[in-house]
Amino acid sequence: MTKKIVALAGDGIGPEIMEASLEVLEALAEKTGFDYEIDRRPFGGAGIDAAGHPLPDETLKACREADAILLAAIGSPQYDSATVRPEQGLLALRKELNLYANIRPVKIFESLKHLSPLKSERIAGVDFVVVRELTGGIYFGDHILEERKARDINDYSYEEVERIIRKAFEIARNRRKIVTSIDKQNVLATSKLWREVAETVAQDFPDVTLEHQLVDSAAMLMITNPAKFDVIVTENLFGDILSDESSVLSGTLGVMPSASHSENGPSLYEPIHGSAPDIAGQGIANPISMILSVAMMLRDSFGRFEDAERIEHAVEVSLAAGILTRDLGGRASTKEMTEAIIARL
């Protein structure tokens, strides 16, 4: 059956890295017989330009009907002070598709270890996943600003906590089988609920070890001993901070993909970096995060594990061969990086 993939190129370097990733997907499909079609839609600043809204109705309709969604990058300086901004499109898309689970893998490529701000021995063996709850918590609670006083409500239901923790256990089952649940149980009521739910869900996964960690000590361990982690699961606010902290371990945002999953609808795959408008159109953008996001899509949405591994291996050996874009310390163009990966599929 033909798989429908919606491509949201977005803004800045988005169109360049999207096309690079689709070239890799096309080359892979020729070798493996993967049957798919691409539906390109405007989104972000491109959506505002085309339809006056960062998430046009037709784009949302296409996303609802898709088997998976690829997003490259959004954001443009021309909208920084505007009422309608590209970033509002992503928030709306997450809400409309109920993308509750953000998955961010953190892996250090051997050939890029020198880019990390940490000593090489400290990042040896780092390979973990951050699972962040994306649609609940303090970001979605009431925000009250009064004269000389303010409060933000952190609100979670049992069901919201259960589904994200269950997702983490399912991921851990196919890895090293360790879940580290991160909370602030010694202070926060929501964290007390979080820990209670984690203990309950763990009973359904006797083959997976559950560990608890307070968020402050987890932030420290991510720097002092990051290799200890396998699958981290945490609430929205903590996950926002810790996933950004984890992204600096590699020393570059240019090789880090991510996914956002719903319960029953399509998943969204995107790089963690921004739209880099300062280098847009120059042909020097690093496409690896977008290409690895395609690999995540093949594995998570379509169960094509070998195809995903072929892409990931091609990326790894290309980097090991010294083919590096400028952000990685090399001179390869977007086109040269893409061609190198395709040649090694």
Question: Language-model segments: which ranges?
Answer:
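Glycine-rich phosphate/diphosphate-binding loop of Rossmann-like nucleotide-binding domains
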Residues: 6-23, 27-29, 147-216, 228
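Flexible, glycine/charged-enriched surface loops at secondary-structure junctions
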Residues: 33-39, 175-183, 205-213, 303-310, ...
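Short acidic loop-to-helix transition motifs that present clustered carboxylates
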Residues: 111, 213-220
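N-terminal beta-loop-helix "entrance" segment that forms/cooperates
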Residues: 33-57, 222
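Buried hydrophobic packing segments
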Residues: 21, 25, 198, 290-301, ...
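Buried hydrophobic positions in well-ordered alpha/beta secondary-structure cores of metabolic enzymes
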Residues: 11-14, 67, 131, 168, ...
